[in-house]
Amino acid sequence: MEGDFIVPFARRGSIVGADELAMVGDLVDSGDVLSAGGLRDQFEARFAKHVGSRYALSVTSGTVALELAIEMLDLEPGDEVIATPQTFQATLQPLLDRDVRVRFCDIDPVTLNIDPTLLRSLVTDRTKAILLVHYGGYPADMDRIMAIARPRGIKVLEDAAHALGTGYFGRRPGALGDIGCFSFHSTKNITTLGEGGMITLDRDDWAERIDRRRNNEADGLYVPDATEEPFLLPWMKFSADVYRWTCVGVRKPGTNATMAEAAAGVGLVQMDKLDSLVERRRWIAGRLDDAIARFPGTRIQRVPSGIEHSYHLYTFFVDHGRDDLVRALHSRGVEVQLRYFPQHLTPEWRWRGHGLGECPVAERLWFDSHMNLPCHPGLSDAQVDHLVDAVSASLRDVLATRQRAS
């Protein structure tokens, strides 16, 4: 039991154990470089193959991935960006210091992703990009979204932080739009020792720019410097090749977002486990679906043929009594979360002119209807049994109370 909960939300979204420890131990014992080495290259190649993109470039967090991806959009003052309100703040934070107009697009009431019908009505001649999230691992309606974006030259950024292991008609998020971003935070479907991110894309020019940006903007030629003989100074004589070359041509501010070799090595091991980790999530989700669907006034996320939900988040909906149900579940030791508070109602976006009524579906679902239950591979069979029993009992109690009141 974690804290006061018999069935807690994930502090770790995957299983990390002996295999990961052995990978890190072997790296330490090898004496190999601990940054920007072979493991990073292998992890990126493996990830690109899984997603189906030409490039996968690792960075230190999902937030950094989003920051660098948004830079590729080359937004100018007066440009408009259409974004989902149903997301964690990191998706939109890089826009706060840009002189662009954000237009929030309301969400589909089942998938909680951008509603393509509403999206079309928000497009103007100034629309430069669409920022979407594959909420909880349920993929957005990408065919309809891209049919709107492509003819108009609008770039589509996929925040796929929830969607590793998700399938979309034989393809995968991160390779459906123009650029994709993933997170390997501790709670995500796989982790790289707590933090990490990946950017997936096909464009050569963007890949080159991102690679430079994550490596201190080193984009120039490498030329011999004063450490070449006969100019080797005494204090350099034990430095091998470290000081023998100097980069020229650095033109812009850069950063160091290099994923450590230990993190990349763990990521490789986690990729081997991905299918089984996601399958466990789907099994738990199936148990919950079967239990919840029996009760009137509830809705589950039914998944159509061709869609493979990865269930980073398990979401369901009630017509009435959501807050009573949350309290009933807490009393039975089940942790419940509500993700996410609509971004257009947060102080930073209200200050920019957004407010209540702008996205009525997102508002109604958050305040009255939707909720997230634990659905992660760290749950034991006994915990899953308790979860299903607690959900059923709590729904019965809430329904009985409403019937007596009526």
Language-model features, listed with the residues they occupy:
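PLP-dependent aminotransferase-like
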Residues: 71-160, 167
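Conserved active-site segment immediately N-terminal to the catalytic lysine
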Residues: 158-193, 208, 247-249
